[in-house]
């Protein structure tokens, strides 16, 4: 996407309009500056605190400055039964936020309590400094790290035989691609046994506009030019939006086949809303998975907007009910 495209939004300075949607400045060389410090929350592992969820950070790859933030519901300390494990990837268009960002920290705390799960939220490398597939590589490294971890929270309270890969927005894209990769090497991840994927408003795109993208081209949160820029900054240099990282339905078969997910018996939950410009692509992916024989649970709500659950507590609670049922049903399914 060119600077001229950005200027069509009504200003000679493309960043004037861009800052309305993303806290970044686009530099002439197509790098970005993040001028605003996004609120973050420190981990709190103290069991004597009043918090219903304990949290702590563990280094994943010091060379990449990546880490995993664990979320442990306090009630797990007093129960003998282990809880399902959710490996979570935050959103942010591949270019913003971290596992410590307050908006995702708070969401994971609520999810841990209401869904009754242990969460390992992965802090992955961001684009454009680290373009895709860097985040996918970090995701796989996290799964391997969890498999081999001797951390007492994971070994004592997380049920490795009931693991789920989940992500929101760009994180949903990461969860999808990490899931395809993990399915291809499932035996190597044992005793970590994945039961399903949770794709929460997963971020996908394509060169040809869908009906929802056209209908919501001037969306107040994710207008077309912002989505295009996110992909320009995140995809490998020279790739277009029909690259498999962006458009999972562009080719007849992905690099890592759906067939393995089906044969492993994994279930896939796809969640979205019709106020999201990417809803058509999310629905198309769910349909394609179903046609491949994958057990899909799809929930597409009327109205709403992208990332509504991060801002609306009632929407979040409704989602946690659906998520908990998906997790419980998946855990009782024999693979």
From Swiss-Prot:
Keyword Acetylation: no
Listed transmembrane segments: none
Annotated residues for binding of paraoxon: 92-93, 169-170
InterPro entries in UniProt: AB_hydrolase_3, AB_hydrolase_fold, Carboxylest/Gibb_receptor, Lipase_GDXG_HIS_AS
Activity modulation comment: Is inhibited by the organophosphates paraoxon and dimethylchlorophosphate (DMCP).
GO MF assignments: carboxylesterase activity
Residues the record marks as active site: 169, 276, 306
Catalytic reactions on record: a carboxylic ester + H2O = an alcohol + a carboxylate + H(+)
Known function: Carboxylesterase acting on esters with varying acyl chain length.
Family: Belongs to the 'GDXG' lipolytic enzyme family.
Protein name (database record): Carboxylesterase 1
Taxonomic classification: Eukaryota, Viridiplantae, Streptophyta, Embryophyta, Tracheophyta
